Amino acid sequence: MRILQACAEIFPLLKTGGLADVAGALPPALRALGAEVRVVVPGFPAILAGLVDAIEVARLEPPPAMVMARGARLLYGRLPACDVDAYVINSPDHYHRDGGPYNDARQHPYDDNHLRFGLLGWVAAKLADGLDPYWAPRVVHAHDWHAALAPAYLRALEWARGRRLAGSVYTVHNLAYQGFFPAHHFGDLGLPAAYNQVHGLEFYGQISFMKGGLYFADRITTVSPTYAREIQGAEQGCGLDGLLRDRDADLSGILNGVDDAVWNPAGDALIPATYTRRKLTGKAQCKATLQAELGLAEDPAVPLLCVVSRLTEQKGLHLVLQALPALIERGFQFALLGSGDAGMENEFRRLAEQHPTAAAVRLGYDEAFAHRLIAGSDLILVPSRFEPCGLTQLYGLKYGTLPVVRRVGGLVDTVADARLETLDHDATGFVFDDFSADGLIGACLRAKALFRRRADWLQVQRRGMQQPFGWEDSARQYLKLYQQVAA
């Protein structure tokens, strides 16, 4: 079956969050099951630099407002770093910018993001309409708000052609990021005027790309079963809960997986020493090396907490800031890798300066350091307000770094709380309910108590490391879904 994945970023060439990890891992997993998978991505410089054997498929003629001065071309080639065949939209005026993929150097969204990512959705739909005369997908799978207009453009093309072109699947990676734009930009997109209403993209006087994906896709997925239920309620529905309840029969949750080729302590070239769940001596070496690298007191008996995250309120990082003084006083160490809210960055930096042998902070993102940090820590904190799936807790499980998570979304689907009655059965981490510093502190203190009981700690650690969170099962679920929408 021919599958087209439409996404804005792909690991390892371009990554701002977990979307890139999924986009990089799902196509090879589907191919291993016999699917013929290609991706379509914007021509950001990092992606173009990774494209080999490129040929020009077409000169693009999208709706007039999307056309920039130098036009746009669709290239086809291979992204060896991602192990996938790819269509790349080569349009420098759209995608070659001084800032990041979505925001400028001052972290302000680009004024023409509706054009930049409308073009991505349009190209995905046109590929189902014969843009490449030698290959057309049976299913178009669009990811997050950036590609969300693909199902809308596909529906419009099918109406114009009077026949079905392809099935469509739309995946919500985070409902909070919807791709909102002023209503007057709708006319730039070249969609039928009838789509600019409540049964379409219109959202309280604006347009929402994500709403377009949710409304027009044949099937909708989220990245965990619990999140699929949560977003149908007002608290986490972000104003779209009514639409999601209406489409409940078409909505399902499929957990993200961990790419074993990237995240595997048994063969990870980015960590000081490899290890397995049966032989954990290498993890102790990773911890000692990390403590030395960060200037922390080199003591194996001190539990080391880590965070790898965007610094936002949604991720619960303000709770970490509130909890850390008490946790450090109670004998924990802490290390963070992340960036985001400027105020939080300053607060974490100040805390590390106040406790130089107990806390360390690195702002930004460094993939190699993320591996060293997770491998060398004892516990990884994911205290999110809401969490569609979460990947860092899965990396923690894989590396024997027990997760401390809040009972929401994909976190509750992937981490089983360690309590006396569960230690011998399914415990893999520590789960708390209250979205508060006290809730986080309580879970960390429970973790420290278990850390002191070495045999019980090892039992939970090894159980976590053997959890089956690879991509094969998730890919099978997606393939079954594709078969349904292609029928």
Curated annotation (Swiss-Prot):
Bilayer-crossing regions: none
UniProt key word DNA-binding: no
UniProt keyword Magnesium, yes or no: no
Pathway assigned to this chain's UniProt record: Glycan biosynthesis; glycogen biosynthesis
Catalytic reactions of this protein: [(1->4)-alpha-D-glucosyl](n) + ADP-alpha-D-glucose = [(1->4)-alpha-D-glucosyl](n+1) + ADP + H(+)
Record keywords, A-Z: Glycogen biosynthesis, Glycosyltransferase, Transferase
Assigned protein family: Belongs to the glycosyltransferase 1 family. Bacterial/plant glycogen synthase subfamily.
NCBIfam families: glgA, PRK00654.1-2
Protein's name according to its UniProt entry: Glycogen synthase
High-level lineage: Bacteria, Pseudomonadati, Pseudomonadota, Betaproteobacteria, Burkholderiales
